[in-house]
Amino acid sequence: MATTFADQAAIAIENVRLFNEIEDKSRQLEEASQHKSQFLANMSHELRTPLNAILGYTELMADGAYGEPSEKMVGILQRLEANGRHLLGLINDVLDLSKIEAGQLELELSDYCIQDIAQTVRSTLEPLAADKKLAFKLELAPALPPGHGDGRRLTQVLINLVGNAIKFTDAGEVAIKADANNGSFYVSVRDTGPGISAADQAKLFQEFQQADNAITRKKGGTGLGLAISKRIIEMHGGRIWVESQPGQGSTFTFTLPVIVERQVEAA
């Protein structure tokens, strides 16, 4: 019996040691993740500042502030500005994600109008749809109530969703639909693109993940926009999901309370 007790005591001591070791490793990993997020936030800020200056001077040169540019030079400057803005968008995505992971992203809660957000997104992205000869529809329910939340961040989410829809749709239409029911907004973005397989849908909202097919590789992207959108919606106490089948287009939908009184912290 003494031997059995000694064996059990040894096992218990070893279990405690293993538990403490796992706890220490978990703490170290969490600290490393926080350091990484802080580094990315600082680095993104340092990159964004000079890039904004480069874009500003490029725009001034294209507008003739330093002398009338030739037609060839205008084309070069326009391509330079377009690529610079694309890079700035990537940096902003990394900055947002690092802020979210570090717990530094705060919602700025105020009144907003979901109709105005939808109209703003359409006016911003309709030229891209027109370039591809895509119809751009708004399907807004009448008399939608005023919302309370972070309207700027919700605009960012909708721009991400509509931008993706336009990027991956080569014919047909893109539509924004908005409705309200039982104290919640229901907003969806529908497209007539190639659709997404069930296997790819499962990873779409993860950081740096995209649908694994030739179309995605051709269109490009970082796989950050949907992950950021998911976190923003969850911070509003809402959720986001996709319904799609290959060859039948996709519909991304998010729902959130009409009135958000406080930010929901990440679990």
What label would you give each PLM region?
Residues 74, 108-113, 130, 135-145:
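Conserved catalytic submotifs in the C-terminal HATPase_c
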Residues 202-206:
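ATPase catalytic-site recognition across NTP-hydrolyzing enzymes
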Residues 67, 119-131:
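Short alpha-helical segment within the cytosolic histidine kinase core of two-component systems
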Residues 65, 98-109:
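Helix-loop junction within the histidine kinase core
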Residues 172, 237-238:
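Conserved glycine-rich
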Residues 23-66:
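Primarily the dimerization/phosphotransfer
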Residues 82-88:
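Short alpha-helical segment of the dimerization/phosphotransfer core of two-component systems
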